Regions:
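Short alpha-helical
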Residues: 1, 99, 117-120, 151
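Amphipathic alpha-helical segments enriched in hydrophobic/aromatic residues interleaved with Lys/Arg
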Residues: 125-157, 163
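A conserved active-site-flanking secondary-structure segment within enzyme catalytic domains
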Residues: 107-135
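Short active-site oxyanion
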Residues: 86-91, 106-111, 142
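Short, glycine-/aromatic-enriched active-site segment of Class I SAM-dependent methyltransferases
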Residues: 176
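Extended, subdomain-level signal for the structured scaffold at the beginning of enzyme domains
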Residues: 1-91, 99-103, 133, 157, ...
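Flexible, glycine/proline-enriched loop segments at strand-loop-helix junctions
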Residues: 67-69, 108-110, 143-146, 159
Length: 198
């Protein structure tokens, strides 16, 4: 969902006339998601030439991956993201993707968020970033982070609104049968989901 949710928002935006191009990239030829879904042949990230105003979206995965030697030693990917950010490419993370951005250093002295179960750990591991708890998404200096899963959809709609206006984002949300648009300031935990014994 961290990948598919925002992807569907942008796809529907294209269907409504947004001038967007979606590219899927990875460090290899294919990926297996944390849920076990195999995603076939994809471009290597280095094949993509980015320009100012583009977006890179890093979906979440098992936190252990972002803490693994395999990820941490992939310096060419890290440098590609850093270079993109210097070119004024917007960098977005969904859920645990914030750990990837923190590791490569582009969240330093910036606000960010992640899934409520991991905000404390993110702040502990990276004390030079400002982790905002209990918000759906943040935006700071061209870097967007979100709490994950459903909030990735909220973030994608926010980006569409910035690019194409409120009414355009409303049309896309309606097409996606979104019950209610949520801003980044909404809480991660819904009061409607509180456990009750009646």
């Amino acid at each position: 969902m961290d990948l598919a949710g925002p992807d569907q928002v942008f796809f529907e935006g294209i269907e409504y006339g947004a001038d967007l191009c979606i590219e899927y990239v990875t460090i290899g030829k294919s990926i297996i998601t944390s849920a076990g879904l195999h995603i076939g042949i994809m471009k290597h990230f280095s094949e993509i030439k980015l320009t100012k105003g583009d977006f890179i979206i890093i979906p979440g995965t098992q936190l252990s991956y972002f803490q693994s030697i395999a990820y941490k030693s992939n310096t060419s990917l890290h440098q590609w993201i850093r270079n993109a950010y210097e070119l004024k490419v917007h960098i977005c993370s969904i859920c645990s993707g914030a750990f990837a951005l923190a590791h490569i250093g582009i969240l330093k002295n910036k606000m960010c968020t992640t899934h409520w179960k991991r905000t404390g750990l993110l702040q502990e591991l990276y004390p030079d970033i400002e982790v905002i708890e209990n918000v759906l998404y943040t935006e700071d200096s061209g870097i967007y982070t979100s709490a994950g899963v459903a909030s990735g959809i909220d973030l994608a709609l926010h980006i569409l609104e910035q690019l194409y206006g409120k009414y355009f984002a409303h049309k896309v949300a309606r097409e996606l049968v979104i019950y209610k648009r949520r801003s980044g300031h909404h809480k991660q935990q819904s009061d409607l989901l509180e456990f009750r014994n009646h």
